[in-house]
């Protein structure tokens, strides 16, 4: 089949050449000169870059062009199994030594040490490693070496891991996954892609012979398929020499199998892949138009950059149209979107895909709406106004990245180099990319963009994927019904899209500016407190952490605890409304159009005991941030049509979730743990009963008095610019300093119930598993040290549970614990663990956890404390270089008067065994211990 899409893009490229005199087809993209790329004689590739964000740390990755697509039928699951085994013993790090050694250096398993396996790749990472000691650098490279070529793959460890992976399958074998397993063969006829989900089959996982895994490792983990990436505060020459020393001796295996990239065939007409499952949470449909993937060998040319930009514009503009439709009461979908990229799970085929989630159950009108807008864009194209907004938004984001070019963290570079190694994605410097796009974007007019879709949206190479909840009384649409629905849309006469843009100002009547009447230095924060003429106080901390970032928050003492029980339904709907509200005469869609090309946003959250505004902007867009802040405090709105649309959207989504075991457990658990009915998750009935006027009244009552709020700004702030903006937009807010809300730090009805709780619920589920929540709670003194001791306690317990319940018992895939403190009076400390598990081992695991908590009261080791504190000190030092950390710390201090940020490293280093044991003993002595369980429902015997 001819690739008409490629021809359309070549036409765009030709037009680009006419305007610039440059051939996009042939002009190579420059590679960032600051990354050193090399290849060893054995075929192994490496990328090394010096970067000091964060200072004194580095990331070490090994990427493998190996995934589940390479498995034979009797090997399904081995690629993923092998990834697990990389943490269970190597020649230089036997047993659990990789994890234990790295954690002793402040590298936390799961957070800084991890891996993933997909269909075409497997990637391992050791991130945020403190590397002041060069021996640590060498040891991290040695770990990568062992992963590449020196796994032990011991019989006993393989057998232990079978149970872990079986539990991972159990926890992930939800409705959507089961549907995918069933429909992928239809989506990929006569292709391996139809049968190669990475988890594999449990028949293989439970029974493969040890030699099969070792043979797979020998065949595929080899230098020509491996890439090493090291980015951080390192000596590039030294790391390169070490890579050559450690990895050059690795030999290619004899008779190595060819690494095949399996093609995906074109199809005449339309493929329909339809599946249903009782536990599918919502009905979703995806309409894909397949096309050839851009050749990897050509991605280094300008033509690829042009293609990415063009398709990005198309998907952005279509997404904006879908958002507009979704906000109408008669919209058939709750949400819809567009994506261009890999055809579902295959790298060797691309697709333009439209997807939508039905409000209730019927996917036929959703498919019609998606197809209708695709054809409208195909036939009439996009308007100049739409393209200008999308283009401005793109250039605004690119400009922000350019301005932050000296503040990029290691992880951003690593991800780019991994993608370059695996997919040959281009890696120009941000300076080069910014310069190139400033040249390309003005030349590409909307008329050029509009020539692409007519070639891509055709009657062939179409794939319809439908996934539905299986419900009694609801028929699953047939292939014929979907085909007829599409034919009906094709018969329609479609009008061009009308682009409506509001011209009036966001703030129609801006008051005369107020004044800054006093300034006070807050030395402990390196900040200044401004007192305004309306009595409001603003704290500002200028920083140089990021050139193009300003963050703000404002916390008020009012919350829903002030409201009577007859407001319960509307209180539950606050988050629904505040997810899609407008401001003044601007609807949510009007705001999206107004903000295109501006990097500024503000959100509002109303909690039980407080209300918070939060937002961000660039220095250039700080005036827009201030506009949004002013309007959020004074005039949050939602039209009747928008409200009805939200109701139908969320009510439908919730109705479909109400048979999902996870949703049912969240509802049941909250009933068991808390007394207040407001704690129970929102239902479809709650949404349908909501009152728009009352919700808006609640919102306005919470933001009516700006003097209730503590405003904090952190970032690259120029005070000469900042002061007049504060006087215009914050000093003019309605405020009454004589009637500030009383601080609400105690709402007993929202606290965990007293005493012992042991509740068990059951639910029907296709894949039986037990889910457990264990929570101990109590009242502890809120001090900076206790906050840190609580965290240390939770992390030590988490590590013990992981080592025993997962690694030794094989009862879970994932388990952890957390211990936290809040400023609330009453039960302000909680120790929580939640996990899904093998039902047969429930009592054994519960008994172990209870006994382990009891043991911890008297046998915490110094080694455990040192390991946790090493990680926490590293994290604390990282936080000192982040605007968000300072914002949270200052905001917390303004609310509760306790500084847990400054001096936190010294506090951590002072924690002793006695501190942890006493904290846990005092917490458990209060006798509040809850166990809430969901078991699979057992069918009654006939």
Tell me what each language-model feature is:
Residues 150, 162, 176, 213-244, ...:
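Non-catalytic, conformational "gating/processing" segments within enzyme and secreted inhibitor domains
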